[in-house]
């Protein structure tokens, strides 16, 4: 279009000098003025006619060009409509066209890509047909599997009905066991009340026995004091006897020798009589003391006999209660075994039902995938049919556009040929005329703004942009079906030992032990001093020296000396066997625990046992605590609760606690664990403990059983 307008401007503004017509003196020489004027007028007329013709031709050309531009705009609108249709098709098929331009080459390329895509879709449909055939075969297999699963479900239903029947029977048995356990609990309550009465009577007997022991010890002390007094009296009596003998000898010697001393002898006889009276009083006191000692001995013998009878009765009662408790424990063990079998059967049935439910879920998902695939294939078939129809429509529209473009191009070529012919004619007509070039005319008004050109080619694909920010989190999906139980994990390594707790408060003082046996008698005292020499007699006449006589008789033994100091205390006697009252826990389990004997393991505190590099403290038989109290007690002992790490430690613990009841372990379930079975209670069994043969089980944390504390052996701690 621009070239055509430029040609018009050149036609309107070109000069005639190029045709050889020039202004000069030759025309004035050949022609006159009149001819010149006529020629000039004719030239003006011809110029006017030419301008009119050129204007008419320009108007026609402009009109034709307006028609052509309107047609091009219409074609552009149609092309944009085709592009929008192609974009819609791209949106429906999920593919994006990159080069959608107004050129035929781009249309051909797009149609080739569409043909390739159609061929790919045809290949995919053929593949999907094979997949459909495979899915049909799988569906047939699934139908057969459904039939087999139905048979399995029917068989499982029969098994479940049988299991329900057995559960009903077990329920009846459990009801009977509940009645028996209620009766046993009532018996246990009666026995506990009797045992409490017996313990009260035993405590009263122990109190009376301690009082009797105190009385006996006081009587023994009084007897010892009386014995010492009697010994002193005996010594005095012997000294008095010696004095009496001496006085008798003196009296005889005086009767024989001196008569004038009769008054003195009479006085001496009075003195002896008074001494004999005092001796008689002492003997009467000794007889009364001996009678009192005999009475106390008879009373102590009667008390000892009653205590022996009470001990025998208590021993018989303990034996009977232990036998009954053993029978109850055996029955409870059998009941626990039956309950374990029942729970095993129930768990097996639940596992079967879970497996069946997982299979059904898998079948359901398979059927859903099959239906989804069938819907997708149906949608693909519909989309393929639509793409085929649209491709045929596009081909028809393309052919029509090609025909129209060919017509328009041919018409434009004809117009251009006509314009060239007109230009040639104009050039031929103007060859014989000289046209003076006039002054340039005024600038014409600005033309209207042309129509918007066609869109250019699509540029190359840009670089990949940066990754956008993550979108908002989607809504939480529905909870999926519970998966099958996983394989139990490996046992984790033992945790690091905690820091030792603060030192516990000092325990209460123990009971006073029984008094020891009577010590051995002391060493006999030194022999008494010799008696006083008698009064010197009158010197007789010196007789003749006689022969040496025989040796005289041995003199009388002197009086017994004072009692020596008491000897060292004797060795402590054997302690009496403790009276063990078996505690009863809230569920009726009886703890038959025996106090472990004290050990002297190096590096371990007293009453602790050593094994390898650890020290263990076993609770006393009467010491039953719940889990939190046991944990606090172990922390007060600068230790922690027992955690078994290997089989050797478990075997050693098994040997130590055999027949001693249940003990706490330092393990506890987390909230919501699978084995937190409530068993008809509000809270679950969250704490672990040791039962028969050192096997562990979960208990209620409020139960009161024994506990075991452990700590490192101080002698085996490496020195840094």
Curated annotation (Swiss-Prot):
Biased composition (Pro residues): 562-576
Keyword Calcium: yes
Domain C-type lectin per the UniProt entry, residue ranges: 611-710
Chief location of this protein within or outside the cell: membrane
Biased composition (Basic and acidic residues): 460-479
Binding annotation for Ca(2+) 3: 673, 675, 685, 697-698
Keyword line: Calcium, Coiled coil, Collagen, Disulfide bond, Lectin, Membrane, Metal-binding, Receptor, Repeat, Signal-anchor, Transmembrane, Transmembrane helix
Domain Collagen-like: 444-503, 510-569
Methyltransferase is among the record's keywords: no
One Pfam family it belongs to: Lectin_C
Disulphide connectivity of cysteines: 604-615, 634-709, 687-701
Membrane-traversing stretches: 38-58
Compartments reported by the entry: Membrane
Chain intervals with Gly residues compositional bias: 504-513
Record protein name field: Collectin-12
Biological source species: Danio rerio
Taxonomy of the source species: Eukaryota, Metazoa, Chordata, Craniata, Vertebrata
